[in-house]
């Protein structure tokens, strides 16, 4: 067992010994799954799905997937059941535990971003290794497969088309790994999604001990949301605001095995 495994095991044991309900929140791309130049090619590995299903079905735990993808997209790619919470578009849409949330900005921003999608996509088509992903309430310029120069040009394309709306504070940008996202200018992010889910889990179980795992800049808000009352793990060498870091999805899978073992060893069900 690695040092990271040992530390997580100790934290889980301590939380369970205090009789707390485990709330596992995890990102998808780069955390549960390896990155791919084509987002449509990413699916959850069966071995990792089995571990997550074991956690989700345990009455001592609740599982939540917090992703920048559309909610239905990440649900389809994980193939996890109704016991799991899903937060899509960095929390603009959330479902789970019989509850649903859709931020008012979700519908307001779609028409504006739709008008920008075609000209941005047309300009990106001239840059090798770049493409535009239209999520509805957000647009993402991807450049993982591009040269450094074309990646910078892709960012410039997005910013040029969006500039009037950025200056008017109607839209904002969010950076991630080899991507730049254009989205509604609202104070809502993965940390807000974590708080929303935690509040609903607390209503059901009376308590929740949050464990957040993520790999990207967009996960920093999630790390901060659990600070002081939970544990955060960066699935990349860059720990950022996380409590500690592991090296990618393979080590995340190892951590999930630790969690399932500790749940099996834990005491009374809450």
Model region roles, listed by residue range:
Residues 2-6, 19, 193-270:
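Mg2+-dependent phosphoryl-transfer enzymes with acidic/Ser/Thr/Gly-rich catalytic loops
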Residues 1-28, 32-36, 47, 79, ...:
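Non-catalytic pre-domain segments flanking phosphatase-related domains
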Residues 98-106, 191, 247-251:
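Short, surface-exposed amphipathic charged segments that create phosphate/polyanion-binding patches used
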Residues 34-36, 96, 242:
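A short acidic, helix-capping loop that chelates divalent metal ions and anchors anionic groups
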Residues 119, 127, 133-211, 217-230, ...:
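Conserved acidic, metal-coordinating active-site core of Asp-based
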Residues 22-24, 84, 210:
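The start of beta-strands in P-loop NTPase/AAA+ ATPase cores
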């Amino acid at each position: 067992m690695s040092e990271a495994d040992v530390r997580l095991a100790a934290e889980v044991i301590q939380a369970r010994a205090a009789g707390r309900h485990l709330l596992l929140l995890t990102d998808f791309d780069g955390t549960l799954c390896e990155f791919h130049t084509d987002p449509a090619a990413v699916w959850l590995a069966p071995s990792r799905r089995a571990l997550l299903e074991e956690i989700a079905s345990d009455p001592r735990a609740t599982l939540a997937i917090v992703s920048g993808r559309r909610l239905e997209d990440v649900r389809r790619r994980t193939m996890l059941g109704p016991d799991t919470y899903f937060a899509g578009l960095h929390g603009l849409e959330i479902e789970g535990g019989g509850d649903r949330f859709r931020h008012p900005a979700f519908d307001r921003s779609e028409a504006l971003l739709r008008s920008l999608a075609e000209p941005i996509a047309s300009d990106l088509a001239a840059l090798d290794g770049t493409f535009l992903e239209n999520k509805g309430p957000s647009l993402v310029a991807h450049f993982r497969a591009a040269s450094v120069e074309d990646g910078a040009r892709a960012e410039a394309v997005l910013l040029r088309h969006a500039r009037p709306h950025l200056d008017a504070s109607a839209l904002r940008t969010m950076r991630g790994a080899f991507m730049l996202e254009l989205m509604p200018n609202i104070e809502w992010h993965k940390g807000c999604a974590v708080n929303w889910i935690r509040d609903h889990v607390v209503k059901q179980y009376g308590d929740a001990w949050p464990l957040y795992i993520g790999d990207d800049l967009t996960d920093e808000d999630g790390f901060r949301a659990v600070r002081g009352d939970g544990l955060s793990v960066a699935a990349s060498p860059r720990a950022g605001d996380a409590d500690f870091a592991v090296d990618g999805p393979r080590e995340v899978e190892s951590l999930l095995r630790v969690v399932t073992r500790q749940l099996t060893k834990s005491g009374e069900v809450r």
